[in-house]
């Protein structure tokens, strides 16, 4: 996600409803749980109240249990201040693209930089080149830990469904996404699945919850049912639908939905709870 010109990341939606429309709670509950070998970490509750802001000065006064804010832009002092108010803090970090405005952009060699993803200055990366990409991401996760964050929101974990410039397969994406979850856990933080609805059945056991964008608008919400069945939170952000158009549906599913302005500058926050 670029912090300059907000737009929804481009991704293929074909077949999502067909695959997941018949998903039952019983089937979802049967999904295997993957044990974490890392240190103990925060376990987000299913009914997690949350606030999301990635640009601008962040106020600490939102009446929620968790904040999701930018890992690079947020100082450790603000994370500490939020902790002193009894809040948990989630670290937004991009793991699927390289953003030319980030301080570590020069760490990405040209060989892993693909096509733009619709955001200025942002390109998909070749997640198959694990020997190159993983050390960069580990340093990003370590930055989150050093600042005191409790969890990570890894963005753009669905390059295989986009025109990335690389012939990424679903299996390669799963390998990378599972590594992301395990690496974050190894550093003592929780981790949320960000979008990627088609791979939820395989990913739920690795992640501690999910954050989805516009699942009501794009009719993808049922794909995240396995998280609810497992007692994990599903945080849904809608940008264009009025709350009266989606809050009842989110509540009936057990999702924690809210409406935000697309720029995520803190200008709009209309929660469903």
Name every feature range the model reports, one short phrase each:
Residues 2-31:
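Secretory targeting and sorting signals
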Residues 32-273:
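Glycan-processing catalytic domains of CAZymes
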């Amino acid at each position: 996600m670029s912090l300059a010109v907000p737009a929804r990341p481009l991704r293929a939606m074909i077949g999502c409803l067909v695959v997941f429309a018949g998903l039952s709670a019983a089937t979802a509950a049967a999904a295997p749980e993957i044990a974490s070998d890392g240190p103990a970490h925060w376990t987000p509750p299913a009914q997690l109240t949350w606030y999301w802001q990635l640009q601008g000065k962040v106020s600490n006064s939102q009446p929620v249990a968790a904040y999701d804010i930018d890992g690079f832009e947020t100082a450790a002092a603000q994370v500490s201040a939020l902790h002193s108010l009894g809040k948990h803090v989630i670290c937004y970090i991009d793991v699927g693209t390289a953003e030319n405005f980030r301080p570590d952009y020069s760490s990405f060699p040209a060989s892993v930089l693909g096509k733009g993803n619709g955001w200025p200055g942002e390109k998909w990366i070749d997640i198959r080149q694990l020997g190159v990409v993983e050390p960069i991401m580990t340093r990003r996760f370590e930055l989150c830990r050093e600042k005191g964050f409790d969890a990570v929101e890894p963005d753009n974990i669905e390059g295989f469904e986009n025109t990335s410039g690389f012939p990424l397969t679903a299996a390669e994406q799963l390998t990378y996404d599972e590594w992301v979850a395990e690496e974050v856990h190894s550093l003592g933080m929780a981790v949320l699945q960000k979008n990627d609805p088609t791979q939820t059945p395989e990913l739920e056991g690795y992640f501690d919850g999910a954050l989805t964008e516009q699942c009501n608008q794009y009719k993808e919400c049922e794909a995240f049912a396995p998280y609810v069945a497992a007692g994990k939170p599903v945080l849904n952000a809608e940008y264009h639908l009025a709350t009266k158009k989606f809050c009842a549906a989110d509540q009936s599913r057990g999702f924690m939905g809210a409406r935000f302005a697309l720029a995520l500058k803190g200008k709009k926050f209309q929660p469903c709870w």
